[in-house]
Amino acid sequence: IRADGSIVLVGNFDVDVEHQQRVGHLFGPLPPEMRNDTAFMDRIHCFLPGWDVPKLNPGLFTEHFGLVSDFLSECFTQLRSQSRVSSLQGRVYWGGALSGRDTNGVNKTVSGLLKLMYPGMQAPVSEEDLEWAVRLALEVRRRVKEQQKRIGAAEFRNTHFSYTMGAEGVEKFVSTPELQSQGGIGDEPLECGQIWTLSPGGQDEHPGLFRLEVTEGPGGGVRVL
């Protein structure tokens, strides 16, 4: 059965996010029939963290001209028949951790974001905006995958989502902010040029843990020897 529409679930998260991550998963507030159904979750393309969305305040409203809501709604309806997935071809390559449903969900999220930023079908999409949309789409889809992993389904254990910009680009990994800890070392692969290392210490020094980062920058001049 093919569906021509989609659904959006909106609700309040009444518990602390960090606590919920320790004792359960982020789909816990859903009704019992849904909260542990990984097959249902696998069809959710995006989990948007409402706790990161700022509340409305006067600074978010404009005094300039705007579009009437019914006209704007019609514009969005017309955009539904279009796709921006072609903007990804030859420019973005997904990592091996993404399944077929992961790729489908991420592609649709990227397409939707690009349609909001570039309503014109022929408008060229900049590399910066494309990478922003790719990273956001991977994050919101991975948030779904992480909850499936917490429920205990072995098929969802690989959540290391990554992408590469261009055929010669460097593979970059995308994580979800709520899983990161300031005081610990996560299991995420490090960026290129970074490594963790241990120092055994010495007679007057204690053992230590160090994170080494290699950076590249322009030179400051020429030295003649």
Per-region residue spans from a language model:
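Short coil-to-beta transition motif at edge beta-strands of beta-rich domains
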Residues: 189-199
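C-terminal regulatory/interaction module of P-loop NTP-utilizing enzymes
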Residues: 1-185
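Basic/aromatic-rich interaction segments and small domains that mediate binding to polyanionic partners
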Residues: 197-225
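Short, surface-exposed loop and linker segments with low hydrophobicity and enrichment for Pro/Ser/Thr
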Residues: 186-191, 215-218
